[in-house]
Amino acid sequence: MSKSFVLHSAFRPSGDQPEAIRRLEEGLEDGLAHQTLLGVTGSGKTFTIANVIADLQRPTMVLAPNKTLAAQLYGEMKEFFPENAVEYFVSYYDYYQPEAYVPSSDTFIEKDASVNEHIEQMRLSATKALLERRDVVVVASVSAIYGLGDPDLYLKMMLHLTVGMLIDQRAILRRLAELQYTRNDQAFQRGTFRVRGEVIDVFPAESDDIALRIELFDEEVERLSLFDPLTGHVEGTVPRYTIYPKTHYVTPRERIVQAMEEIKLELAERRKVLLANNKLLEEQRLTQRTQFDLEMMNELGYCSGIENYSRFLSGRGPGEPPPTLFDYLPADGLLVIDESHVTVPQIGGMYRGDRARKETLVEYGFRLPSALDNRPMKFEEFEALAPQTIYVSATPGAYELDKSGGEVVDQVVRPTGLLDPIIEVRPVATQVDDLLSEIRLRTAINERVLVTTLTKRMAEDLTEYLEEHGERVRYLHSDIDTVERMEIIRDLRLGEFDVLVGINLLREGLDMPEVSLVAILDADKEGFLRSERSLIQTIGRAARNVNGKAILYGDKITPSMAKAIGETERRREKQQRYNEEHGIVPQGLNKKVVDILQLGQGLAKTKAKGRGKAKAVEPAGLSAVDMTPKALQQKIHELEGQMMQHAQNLEFEEAAQIRDQLHQLRELFIAAS
């Protein structure tokens, strides 16, 4: 099933890209464990990495600092490798409240979570791809360092079926139940199976659009066919098929029985300790909770909060690292850490917070001490387990530079010839009025502006002031969730408004070619929001536009400002020199606005679950201009139905896209009428 990586792109490597690709590949082939790619904003770092993957033909994991950037990277990699397995692995929780105890108020908070089914399916698809083939790119968030089912147990639980094999129907049903599939003859959905006579239909947990039909005759598998679970249309037959477990945490029965004995032993030891310390309430609480879990495991094969017993279920010793996505990556895999100056510190910070919460639960008798081993990896464990690594950032941190021995692969020259923004420093006293006049210059020529402030209060006041002066402005703050944030960025690019005000949200990786001006208020207030790295990242948001400019408002030039200005000027000089030598004229980027929302709920395939297929979002392009008023009215009515369908299915990004089309069509309808 494994193919070779085939890179699809209308462009060839240019600028600094060929040299960067050559150096990275040489380093990997020479066995270098760590390399750093210092690539400026808009220099095509993702394209460089895609070329390295395609040339070396190695399975790759790309770590991103958050879901927004992971979504953006997933969309880009999917375009580069349409024939290969590009997978997405982020936390599947839409909402997560971990189990916790607050001793001061004697409050126990139960675990509460809302799981996104679509992302769960994509996680299962990612691990399946890593186990089955080599042409895999998995784009992951820091969720990759959290415990996952043991790959050895996961492989043991798989159900292999081949045409002609002798197997009893009841044996298949029993195995499906062990894989945690549920029988549902009415509603056929992911992770279920149905039985009709000698025919068993299975909807694999890792699939979103293909189901398996097993046809038996006299205890023999007569035919295995793949079909569309929605329409029932048979796509074709296969000689063999492997059904993977419904969850990563599935465990064979004999392992559960063994784990239960080990849990009982630990409970007995812990009870002695608690009684010796006169903690009678804690002892009673722990006994009651653990025995309830053991009974549930005995009857059902799992229990609520079974992850707290993961050490026993995976057969690990005390303190050993949990199995994670890294255990599924082949030994010669490649790790790419995007925006490494943010992602690397995140990896280091996950373990301690988790540990502090669980220690309280153990101390007060809510959990056994072994629950402490259900945890994310420690940083040292991550370092020991990580394969050959490429750190990618416009502003690498001290850790990456140290690991790379101070050597960096420079990618400063952009293929488009675009230069780093011109930087001006202006006084603070008149910053708001000066900003207003600059905004008006930009909006007059249909360009966008980003403004970054130091405090939430100032951002709110500035937004209000700009609105009073007739500017179309929005304010981006930490209370806005990921999806809404992506919508706001998309609306800025579409021209629904012209100015976006934020604090620390307008930085890494955000791809907005329409932005020609970045204004940094109070740039001379030294601190983490105005550090050299933060300033370079924020200035970089204007680097995708031909007229890119950054204005730093400050009464003095701080060391951070001086370094950021110096680095930007160094890059700009190198870029100008390259353009002059090669006769390149800088060109703006014409990036499709839908790109940032490529992930969506259905990832390019907008499917309404259980309610029939929603039509793919159609562009309200040139054809709409030629329509008659009656045809336009019909089209508007049709799209309104689609929009409501998407909204009902919680597919808000698709609904928002159709809303924008409706806005354009209504304007055309008014003009035509």
Swiss-Prot record:
Every Helicase C-terminal domain range: 431-597
Main location: cytoplasm
Membrane is among the record's keywords: no
Segments forming domain UVR: 633-668
A Gene Ontology biological process term: nucleotide-excision repair
UniProt entry keywords in alphabetical sequence: ATP-binding, Cytoplasm, DNA damage, DNA excision, DNA repair, Excision nuclease, Helicase, Hydrolase, Nucleotide-binding, SOS response
GO molecular function, one term: ATP binding
Domain Helicase ATP-binding: 26-183
Protein's cellular compartments: Cytoplasm
HAMAP family on file: UvrB
Function statement: The UvrABC repair system catalyzes the recognition and processing of DNA lesions. A damage recognition complex composed of 2 UvrA and 2 UvrB subunits scans DNA for abnormalities. Upon binding of the UvrA(2)B(2) complex to a putative damaged site, the DNA wraps around one UvrB monomer. DNA wrap is dependent on ATP binding by UvrB and probably causes local melting of the DNA helix, facilitating insertion of UvrB beta-hairpin between the DNA strands. Then UvrB probes one DNA strand for the presence of a lesion.
Subunit structure: Forms a heterotetramer with UvrA during the search for lesions. Interacts with UvrC in an incision complex.
Protein's name according to its UniProt entry: UvrABC system protein B
Gene encoding the protein: uvrB
